[in-house]
């Protein structure tokens, strides 16, 4: 499910093992570690993943609504939420979320509460907002995680606090559990809604189904996103029963093909042993990158990550290295000075070995 906290999706590519010699690691086909897809297409379509979704696209609005209700019923038990709303895009999800929060406050007698504080963090100099927030003059961006600064922004007009548990726009940052816990305390103290943007870090990428589960901090509202290569995008707005009081009818229904892909995704994520497999691959990726980092200290200044979201920090701009890796068949993501590696959940150890070998070769070429 791409926000302005993350890059837009692109066509995923099949996994490969690059052929490496002394001068090149050019791959027969790109190996996509850019985060564009949750699954390698052939893995997702294969019989190893259980997909209980009905066959064929729904032919009527009633069929689509039934498919949507069934998917909501699958998502709610595996999340904190009591209610789930499925929308055709992330922009739609955030617009519905904003109106739901504001309407909730009106219903409980706090009509002045309309402002959203978006905690973008100190690394985001441009303070970009999630899609759907454009043109709303009651959105405030906070470029620090200092708790005193946050409390200074809270006033009688504040309705909600929004943060991404893992930030991936201007760089890469796993927001600490202590920061999220303080936001939860502030929201509870002032009667605010705590919203999490899990459009990139949710749905298993962190090694758990939802990234915030690592911290033990539970939001009131969350938006997640799925953008498969062969189906329309799908966004999920997950909320507590208390907040759902502010829901309005008439929201745009997600497309039938998107709902089918959503069923397949949730069924795969719910397959016994699947999340354990993702965690094992996460540890393997982290181990291999840690070894690379210590071998190539001249190239990288830091390594950070959570699950299948790992980031190598360079002394300068990461874009030149991203371009060189792409030329050799490894797709990554440049985020300022950070090179992001976000493989699909179905990544194999051989894919990780191939990616690390490619990075190692490019580093060796640059040191010559």
What label would you give each PLM region?
Residues 2-368:
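Conserved N-terminal phosphate-binding loop of PLP-dependent enzymes in the Aspartate aminotransferase
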């Amino acid at each position: 499910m791409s926000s302005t906290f993350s890059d837009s999706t692109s066509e995923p590519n099949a996994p490969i093992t690059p052929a490496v010699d002394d001068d090149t690691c050019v791959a027969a086909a790109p190996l996509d570690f850019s985060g564009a897809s949750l699954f390698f297409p052939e893995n997702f379509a294969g019989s190893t993943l259980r997909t209980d979704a009905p066959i064929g696209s729904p032919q009527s609005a009633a069929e689509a609504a039934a498919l949507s209700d069934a998917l909501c019923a699958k998502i709610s038990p595996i999340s904190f939420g009591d209610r789930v709303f499925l929308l055709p895009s992330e922009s739609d999800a955030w617009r519905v979320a904003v109106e739901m929060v504001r309407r909730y406050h009106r219903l409980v007698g706090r009509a002045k509460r309309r402002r959203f504080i978006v905690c973008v963090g100190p690394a985001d100099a441009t303070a970009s907002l999630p899609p759907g927030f454009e043109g709303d003059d009651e959105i405030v961006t906070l470029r620090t995680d200092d708790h005193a600064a946050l409390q200074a922004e809270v006033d009688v007009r504040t309705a909600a606090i929004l943060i991404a548990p893992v930030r991936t726009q201007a760089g890469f940052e796993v927001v600490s559990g202590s920061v999220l816990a303080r936001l939860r305390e502030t929201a509870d103290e002032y009667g605010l809604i705590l919203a999490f943007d899990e459009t990139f870090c949710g749905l298993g990428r962190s090694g758990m189904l939802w990234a915030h589960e690592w911290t033990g901090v539970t939001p009131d509202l969350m938006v997640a996103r799925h953008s498969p290569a062969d189906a329309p995008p799908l966004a999920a707005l997950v909320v507590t029963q208390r907040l759902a009081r502010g829901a309005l009818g008439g929201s745009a229904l997600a497309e039938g093909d998107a709902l089918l892909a959503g069923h397949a995704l949730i069924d795969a994520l719910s397959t016994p042993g699947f999340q354990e497999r993702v965690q094992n691959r996460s540890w393997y990726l982290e181990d291999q990158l840690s070894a690379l980092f210590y071998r190539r200290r001249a190239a990288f200044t830091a390594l950070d990550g959570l699950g299948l979201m790992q980031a190598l920090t360079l002394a300068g701009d990461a874009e030149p290295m991203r371009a060189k890796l792409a030329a050799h068949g490894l797709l990554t993501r440049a985020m300022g000075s950070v090179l992001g590696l976000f493989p699909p959940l179905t990544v194999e150890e051989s894919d990780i070995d191939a990616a690390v070998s490619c990075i190692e070769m490019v580093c060796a070429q640059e040191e010559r």
